[in-house]
Every structure is written in structure tokens, then in C-alpha cells.
Design a protein with these regions (language model features):
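Long, compositionally biased stretches
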Residues: 1-49, 69-148, 153
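Extended catalytic/binding region for NAD+/ADP-ribose chemistry, centered on the ART fold
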Residues: 51-56
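Short active-site loop/helix that positions an aromatic residue
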Residues: 58-68
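Long, low-complexity, intrinsically disordered segments
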Residues: 151-162
Length: 162
């Protein structure tokens, strides 16, 4: 995947590969091909925040050459601290990928309801109260399992899978 503008804080890193964490995991790895020590954990935000709304401008759609809605995928970067209850997602700056041409872009949303450190488990608890507890418990179990299978370096700069 090519990110012509890079990511916020990493503008020089433009080439990535998107990897599955495990077949049943909600997480993906965005591994830099420019610097093998850099990888980010991604998740589909709709899995824990079904009302998440990303307004993409015509310019961004044009930049990514998105022709059909199904070609676009939205992901957010998450942080995975040692305690999974403190796992957060950057809902303020999602990534949009065009799976057809393998281009992507990180955008910054103007919506003040979204933060760079949105607590995932709190959102899952809200969802459990609103919907059925079975769905939320399954998501919590997947998140905890994926978290236990992952390891984050102390400085947060490197993420590796066991």
C-alpha cells in the first residue's frame, strides 16, 4: 500500500503492507516497508463504534481515485498498552484505503466528538448495554486474545507479533 503523504509523524514512510494479525482477529498490522522497525496496529472502527462517521471530501476521493464505495476501507490506529482496558483508538485521524489501487491516506476529521485516544473497551461496554451482550462479549474476548498475542515495545515505536 502506498501512502503518498505518509502518516502523521511519519511523512517519510510511504510504502506499507497490510497484514492480518490472525484469521479471527479484529486487528490488522500496517507494516512499513521503508523501515521494518515501524508497524501500526489497525482496527475497523465500526466494530466497536457502529455510529462512527467519516466525512470524506471530494478531493480526498479524487486523490485516492475511489470509484465505488466498496473500494474504500476505513481503519484507525490503536495503541495497545499492557492493560487492554486502556486500549485506545485514534478516531480523529482515520486511514482511508483504496483496496483496488492500493493507495491510502490519513485524514484529520473536524468532528470534536472524536479524539486521538478514544477508549475502545469503554465503547464496547456502551455497545453491550445498547445491544446484546453476546456480541460485545465476543468482541471483548477477541480484543483480549489479540492483545495477549501482541507485544508493544516500551517506547511504543515498534510493534511485533509473537
Amino acid at each position: 500500500i502506498t501512502l503518498p503523504a505518509g502518516l502523521i509523524g511519519f511523512p517519510e514512510l510511504k510504502q506499507y503492507i497490510l497484514l492480518d494479525h490472525e484469521s479471527d482477529s479484529p486487528f490488522k498490522w500496517l507494516q512499513s516497508l521503508d523501515d521494518g522497525a515501524i508497524a501500526f496496529v489497525l482496527i475497523n472502527p465500526l466494530l466497536f463504534k457502529p455510529d462512527y462517521l467519516v466525512e470524506v471530501s471530494e478531493t480526498e476521493i479524487s486523490d485516492l481515485k475511489i470509484e465505488a464505495e466498496e473500494d474504500a476501507v476505513i481503519s484507525v490506529i490503536i495503541t495497545m498498552p499492557s492493560n487492554p482496558k486502556n486500549m485506545t483508538a485514534n478516531l480523529k485521524a482515520p486511514l482511508i484505503f483504496n483496496l483496488k489501487n492500493r493507495f491510502g491516506k490519513q485524514i484529520i476529521l473536524n468532528n470534536s466528538a472524536y479524539t486521538t485516544r478514544h477508549n475502545i473497551m469503554e465503547e464496547v461496554k456502551k455497545r453491550a448495554e445498547e445491544a446484546g451482550k453476546d456480541d460485545a462479549q465476543q468482541l471483548v474476548a477477541k480484543v483480549k486474545k489479540a492483545h495477549s498475542d501482541s507485544q508493544v515495545a516500551q517506547d511504543g515505536s515498534k510493534v511485533t507479533a509473537k
